[in-house]
């Protein structure tokens, strides 16, 4: 079912780093992408860039050899989300996500929609609690538990719905591995090399801290995309992870 013209997914990427692209210009995005090696990372395309540039942009990244995490956080009725996830799979992305708060029926429908894709199906993960949210934010939504407790509730729901993993804060990673098992993938934004600006992420960790906590894939944006030498920054982060030295 997947578009036969798309470059096959890169099955040899061992890096846990996913670079978050955040550009208003496609030319600027591709200029950055052409400075890094697809063996060193995967790429995340979110709502803004997908809305601006569409599926063709994802295909362009894939043609350059990159695996793509399509970060659109689908949240709708089960049938709509199932069709959206299938469309993402047909595009050939490496990973796609939904909101766990959409419930178990929605997540199960999304998982079922990927069955026809077999081994070519993307990883299907769910968003638990956004890393920009704290207890005050949750209280405003009528949720009286801590972000960690809410993330655990939603992670268990995701696991029971048959999905591959969750997006979560690195602070919840160790506990979620205990609750959901080592095979359950944890994808974590809010990762900043030591000394980086924290931006709008409140619950952050360094790459080495995230690795030690059990994170499988760490999403890093501006510390790499705004670096004067992004390829070297990527190499430095990977070296720190391999050597167990904080970057």
Swiss-Prot record:
<dbReference type="InterPro" id="IPR013785">
    <property type="entry name" value="Aldolase_TIM"/>
</dbReference>
<comment type="pathway">
    <text>Pyrimidine metabolism; UMP biosynthesis via de novo pathway; UMP from orotate: step 2/2.</text>
</comment>
<feature type="active site" description="Proton donor">
    <location>
        <position position="73"/>
    </location>
</feature>
<keyword id="KW-0456">Lyase</keyword>
<dbReference type="InterPro" id="IPR014732">
    <property type="entry name" value="OMPdecase"/>
</dbReference>
<dbReference type="InterPro" id="IPR001754">
    <property type="entry name" value="OMPdeCOase_dom"/>
</dbReference>
<comment type="function">
    <text>Catalyzes the decarboxylation of orotidine 5'-monophosphate (OMP) to uridine 5'-monophosphate (UMP).</text>
</comment>
<comment type="similarity">
    <text>Belongs to the OMP decarboxylase family. Type 1 subfamily.</text>
</comment>
<dbReference type="InterPro" id="IPR047596">
    <property type="entry name" value="OMPdecase_bac"/>
</dbReference>
<dbReference type="Pfam" id="PF00215">
    <property type="entry name" value="OMPdecase"/>
</dbReference>
<feature type="binding site">
    <location>
        <begin position="71"/>
        <end position="80"/>
    </location>
    <ligand>
        <name>substrate</name>
    </ligand>
</feature>
<dbReference type="GO" id="GO:0005829">
    <property type="term" value="C:cytosol"/>
</dbReference>
<feature type="binding site">
    <location>
        <position position="192"/>
    </location>
    <ligand>
        <name>substrate</name>
    </ligand>
</feature>
<feature type="binding site">
    <location>
        <position position="131"/>
    </location>
    <ligand>
        <name>substrate</name>
    </ligand>
</feature>
<keyword id="KW-0210">Decarboxylase</keyword>
<feature type="binding site">
    <location>
        <position position="201"/>
    </location>
    <ligand>
        <name>substrate</name>
    </ligand>
</feature>
<comment type="subunit">
    <text>Homodimer.</text>
</comment>
<dbReference type="GO" id="GO:0006207">
    <property type="term" value="P:'de novo' pyrimidine nucleobase biosynthetic process"/>
</dbReference>
<dbReference type="GO" id="GO:0044205">
    <property type="term" value="P:'de novo' UMP biosynthetic process"/>
</dbReference>
<dbReference type="InterPro" id="IPR011060">
    <property type="entry name" value="RibuloseP-bd_barrel"/>
</dbReference>
<dbReference type="GO" id="GO:0004590">
    <property type="term" value="F:orotidine-5'-phosphate decarboxylase activity"/>
</dbReference>
<feature type="binding site">
    <location>
        <position position="44"/>
    </location>
    <ligand>
        <name>substrate</name>
    </ligand>
</feature>
<dbReference type="InterPro" id="IPR018089">
    <property type="entry name" value="OMPdecase_AS"/>
</dbReference>
<keyword id="KW-0665">Pyrimidine biosynthesis</keyword>
<protein>
    <recommendedName>
        <fullName>Orotidine 5'-phosphate decarboxylase</fullName>
        <ecNumber>4.1.1.23</ecNumber>
    </recommendedName>
</protein>
<feature type="binding site">
    <location>
        <position position="22"/>
    </location>
    <ligand>
        <name>substrate</name>
    </ligand>
</feature>
<feature type="binding site">
    <location>
        <position position="222"/>
    </location>
    <ligand>
        <name>substrate</name>
    </ligand>
</feature>
<feature type="binding site">
    <location>
        <position position="221"/>
    </location>
    <ligand>
        <name>substrate</name>
    </ligand>
</feature>
């Amino acid at each position: 079912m997947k578009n036969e013209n798309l470059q096959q997914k890169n099955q040899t990427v061992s890096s846990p780093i996913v670079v978050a692209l955040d550009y208003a210009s496609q030319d600027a995005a591709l200029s950055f992408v052409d400075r890094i090696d697809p063996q060193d990372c995967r790429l995340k395309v979110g709502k803004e860039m997908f809305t601006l540039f569409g599926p063709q942009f994802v295909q362009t990244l894939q043609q350059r050899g990159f695996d793509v995490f399509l970060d659109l956080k689908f949240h709708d009725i089960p049938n709509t989300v199932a069709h959206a996830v299938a469309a993402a799979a047909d595009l050939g992305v490496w990973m796609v996500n939904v909101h766990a708060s959409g419930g178990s029926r929605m997540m199960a429908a999304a998982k079922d929609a990927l069955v026809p894709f077999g081994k070519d199906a993307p990883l299907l993960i769910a968003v638990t609690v956004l890393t920009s949210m704290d207890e005050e934010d949750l209280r405003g939504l009528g949720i009286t538990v801590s972000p960690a407790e809410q993330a655990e509730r939603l992670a268990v729901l995701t696991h029971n719905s048959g999905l591959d993993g969750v997006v979560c804060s690195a602070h919840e990673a160790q506990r979620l591995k205990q609750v959901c098992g080592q095979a359950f993938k944890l994808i974590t934004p809010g990762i900043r090399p030591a000394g980086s600006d924290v931006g709008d992420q409140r619950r952050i960790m360094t790459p080495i801290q995230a690795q030690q906590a059990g994170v499988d894939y760490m999403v890093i944006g501006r510390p790499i995309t705004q670096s004067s030498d992004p390829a070297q920054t990527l190499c430095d982060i990977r070296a720190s992870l391999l050597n167990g030295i904080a970057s």
